[in-house]
Amino acid sequence: MESAKSISKIVKSLFLFLFLGTIASAQNFKLLRYDENYESLKDSSRNFYENLKFVPLNQEKDFYLSFGGEARYEYVDFNNEDWGRLNIGHNNFLLQRYDLHADIHLGKNFRVFAQLRSALQDGRINGPRGIDEDQLNIQNLFLDVTLWQQKDKKLILRAGRQELDYGSGRLISVREGPNARLYFTGGKIMYASSRFSIDAFAMMADTIYAGVFDNKMSKQLNLWGAYSKIIFPKAGNLDLYYLGIKRNESLFEQGIAPEKRHTAGTRFWKYGGGFIYNLEAAYQFGSFGSGNINAWTASADIGYSFENTKFKPTINLRNDYISGDLNKNNENLQTFNPLYPKGGYFGFSPQVGPVNLIDIHPYATLDLLPELKMQVDVVFNWRYSTNDGVYRPSGTLNLAGSASDERYIGTAYLANFTYSVNKYISVVSGIQYFKTGAFINDIIPNSKDGVFFNARLGFKF
C-alpha cells in the first residue's frame, strides 16, 4: 500500500506542474498508451513537458526514452444496486487510479515498454469488486522486436505482459470504464501495412488480488487467436477474427464445468461524418463439460453524424441479439460468452451484461460547446431465452432465470457529460435510472428501481 501511495504522490506532483505550467500541444493520448510515438520531437526545441516525452539517450537520438502517466478520481453513488436484491440501499464510494509508464526505444528494431498501475477503492459498503481495486501491479512490461520493415509494411514480435483491445470491445477489451484495467502475459506477432493489419497472439491471464504485486499468473494458455482489419477506402473497414479460450471452471445457469470455446466473427464499420455504422456477428462452438457449445451474437448500430450542423448532433439506433441457453437440463450449452468485454458496452455502469439478451438502444450525442459533449441513451432489455438468466457486464451469472417465464428485464435511461478542460484534464459525469421490468419484479421480491451517479476527474500527460 505504501508503494501505491508513493506512486500517487509522484503522479500528483507531475500533474500539478502540468496544470500550472504552459504546456505545448502534442498528439492525442491513446487508449493503449504504448501506441503513442513521440519521435517527432527529435529535431525540435523542447519545453519541460516535451523533454519528458522525448529524452535522447545517445547523440544520434535513435535511442530515446519517453515518460507518461495518468491520475483518475471518481465519486460513485449507487442506490438499489442489483435492484434491491442485496438490501444495501444507498452505497457511495471513491475510486482512484494512478499509473506511470516509460517507453524505451533502442534504435529502429528494439523497444521496451513498462507501466505501473495502482487502482484503489474506499467506502463501498459491500467491499471492492474485482473491477475496483488492485493496489499496485505491473500493467505492461514487454519487449518489441521489429523483424522486418519495408516502406509502410512492418512485422513486429511482442513478448511479455501487455494490454489488449480489439474492435468495439465486445470480446477483447482493456476495460477502460472500470477502475482496474485488464492485461495478459504472452506473445504476439503483428503485421501492418497501409490497408491491412493482423495480430496473432497466445496469452495467459492472471488471477487478480487486491494487494501489492500479489497477482498470480495462471501458467496455462487462457486466450489465443488472431484479429485482422482490412480498410476499404470510402466504404469502411472489415474486421475478421478468431478467438479461443480455455477455463478450468466457468459458471452459467446450467452449472459449473470446464470450458473450451472458439469464436469466429466479423465486423463491418465506418465512423466519421455522414452515415455511420457498426455491424458485427460472431458464432461460438466448443465444449462445456461433456456437452457441446452452440452460441451466437449479432449486432447492428446505424446512425448519422451531422458534422456541418450546429452542435454537431449524431443519432444512432442499435439492436443486439445475444444467445442464451435453451435447456439447462441437458448437457449442451447455447449461452454466449463475451470473453473479456469492456464494462460499459451498453452504457456506463450497465446493470445487464452481453449474455442471453435482446436490446433496442437508441442514443444521441450533442457538442453543447466545443469542450462539452453530451450523450443520452435509452436501453430496452429482454432475455433472449426464458430458460437462462441475467448476467453481469463481465459475463458472470447474476440472476438465475429459468424459474420465471417473464422476458422483459427493464429499461435504462442514461445521460452523460464530458468536459475537456484541455488536452490533459477532463471531467466526466453521468446519471442512470433503471426501471425494473416484469422479469426482475418476478424474481426479486419487493424489487426497486436503480439509480446510479458518478463524477470523474482525469489527468493525463
Language-model-detected regions and their locations in the chain:
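Transmembrane beta-strands of outer-membrane beta-barrel pores
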Residues: 73-79, 116-122, 161-165, 193-195, ...
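Outer-envelope beta-barrel architecture signal
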Residues: 61-67, 108-112, 153-155, 194-196, ...
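Signature for the C-terminal beta-barrel architecture of outer-membrane proteins
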Residues: 147, 151-157, 170-171, 175-329, ...
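Membrane-embedded beta-strand positions of outer-membrane beta-barrel proteins
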Residues: 67-69, 114, 157-159, 189, ...
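Surface-exposed loop and membrane-interface regions of Gram-negative outer-membrane beta-barrel proteins
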Residues: 78-96, 106-152, 170-173, 211, ...
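Extracellular/periplasmic loop regions
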Residues: 28-46, 254, 292-402
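Outer-membrane beta-barrel "beta-signal"
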Residues: 28-40, 448-461
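N-terminal periplasmic/intermembrane-space "pro-region" immediately following the signal or transit peptide
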Residues: 2, 24-90, 315
